[in-house]
Amino acid sequence: MRMEKIDENTIRVLLENDDLEERGITGLDLLSNHKKIERFFYSILEEVDQDHVFANNDAVTFQVLPNEQGLELLISKNLSNLDLNKAQSEMVQGKDGITEYIKDQLLKRDTASSEDDEEDDEIESYLNQADNPTKQVVLGFDTFEDWIALAQQLHIESGVSNLFVYKHQYYAQLVFFLENTTETFVQDDLAVANEFGHKTNYTADFLSEYGQRVMENSALELTRYYFKD
């Protein structure tokens, strides 16, 4: 971990993947484990703020910039009202909202992007039309590593994938758009999926209600991106 004091109100912390691993932080934690990430960020603040100048300030903000090497964390205090208003679209103040901001950054989702919204709307519209045939399967995984291994092997040509966490267990919903593929391709993909996961009685609706959806629509692609070989 490297720390640089940019000025009296801003500290930059560079955390490499090894630093995250040493602290027991995984990519999935950054997406789903609210309490763990909350503790993690404030533990970093405690490490670098030995004089407690930042920790004793109620208006501390965090800006998270993920990269392939790890994370860049900017910690700021004493922002003016103008700067604070400007920063709130880019930064997270205090504990509330930290995980949601990281999730947006890690999934490279621009919440103001109409293109992303339109794509999500198109997928939702397709799934909601009864005359659009789909095949849906939900699989459970013994470990997150099993899910990563599947993501590195399985490339769905026409469909979506969602990743859920429920009671510390990982589940994936695979949805195949049958209009744009063949039964043979679907069966081949399912054969690959069954090598790494196992069938479960849980439905996607159940997991959405009682668990947490941590990757939506492109879970396979996102996992491949963030968990490379």
Curated annotation (Swiss-Prot):
One of its GO terms (molecular function) is protein-macromolecule adaptor activity. Coiled coil: none annotated. Transmembrane segments: none annotated. It comes from the Bacteria. Belongs to the MecA family. Enables the recognition and targeting of unfolded and aggregated proteins to the ClpC protease or to other proteins involved in proteolysis. The N-terminal domain probably binds unfolded/aggregated proteins; the C-terminal domain interacts with ClpC. Homodimer. This is Adapter protein MecA. It comes from Latilactobacillus sakei subsp. sakei (strain 23K) (Lactobacillus sakei subsp. sakei). The gene is mecA.
